[in-house]
Design a protein with these regions (language model features):
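A conserved regulatory-domain signal marking ACT and ACT-like small-molecule sensing domains
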Residues: 1-164
Length: 164
């Protein structure tokens, strides 16, 4: 399990999903050496919504780049959230074990920790949460999987040996 805190999220709404939009936006961010994390895109009718997280220290520059991109497009609106964190469960054993996501989500919900965003891959499940809940979320997820904090064992081995 891992915790990454001091994150901000930039959301772009009411932009037409034109070919190349994502490349244009994220190339501009990359040229400014802004590391982007947890990208989510959804379509809402003819418009699209793109949201992504960045380290808090990069938030000001990211906002300027997004504002400039929206001005060039002549459409869209931006919103910014601060005070976020990301808690993740990581391990290659997850792709062969059903129920890892449900265990994580249930544990966070039972602890009263709200989830703002979820991203997954074959080896990772990440939840964006309020920064203030970060440490408690990490401890909650560790407990849900029967892990000790800082015990040095890999989550893949621990998931393999636990019942999901």
């Amino acid at each position: 399990c891992a915790l990454k805190d001091e994150l901000g999220r930039v959301s772009i709404r009411q932009v037409r999903n034109v070919v190349g939009l994502q490349g244009r936006l994220f190339t501009a961010l990359a040229h400014s050496n802004i590391v982007v994390d947890d990208i989510v895109q959804t379509e809402q009718g003819a418009a699209t919504m793109i949201a992504f997280t960045v380290e808090h220290e990069d938030l000001g520059d990211a906002k300027q780049i997004v504002a400039r991109t929206l001005t060039e497009l002549g459409e869209g609106e931006m919103s910014v959230e601060v005070g976020l964190a990301k808690v993740s469960v990581v391990g290659v054993g997850m792709k062969s074990h059903a129920g890892v996501a449900s265990r994580m989500f249930r544990a966070l919900g039972d602890a009263g920790i709200g989830i703002h965003n979820i991203t997954t891959s074959e080896i990772k499940i990440s939840c964006i949460i309020d920064h203030a809940e970060g440490q408690r979320a990490l401890e909650t997820v560790h407990s849900a999987f029967g892990l000790g904090l800082g015990n040095g064992a890999t989550i893949a081995m621990q998931i393999d040996s636990s019942r999901v």
